[in-house]
Amino acid sequence: KLRGLGYEPGLAEESVFTAVKAPVFSFAKLSTVDTFLSPEMKSTGEVMGVDKDHRVALYKALIASGLYIPRGGNVLIATGEWDREDCIALSKRFSRLGFRLMAVEDDHNHLTDAGLLAELVPEDSILDFIKTDKVSLVLSTHAKAGVPGRLGFAIRRTSMEYNIPCLTSLDTANAILDVLEHLAECGEPDIYALDEYSRYDRKNG
């Protein structure tokens, strides 16, 4: 019995740490698959980030999953029509962090109408911008996920093939902005070995 091993019944004490799990996908091995997530997609594994702050835990999980998060540079915005209004506030946050905005025509018009400074990227030059490292981060929520002939599919696949982080959801983008704003204010996170977490938890629990 568990009691004979020294375990007591009931719930464990709440930890001072937050753990965030992130899925890992094998997009690099599947050349015709869109990176825009859909309900039928399955991850090939999971990783976990742990920290006292949930934003840092997310940051660690994303890094472990292979998603590099740049601290600056050019962010390319290519969203669906339904996302453009919400994208304005998000773009302002990117600008405050020092990112330079780049956008396809419809997004560019929407951003400039809102008073934001953004560079217009011609549609026939978008993939070249990604391939030549002129873009540090991509936000692509174009519709018709999985359709090879669509611009959104081409942007997402090219970003993946050239190791440019590509976000396909405004919720994810906002969460990553929370992380970047926290790191800008508080600096780099602490890194612990796994056994150090249990010792810290007992000491501070």
Where are these regions (language model features)?
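ATP-dependent carboxylate/acyl-activation modules
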Residues: 1-167, 173-176, 182, 186-189, ...
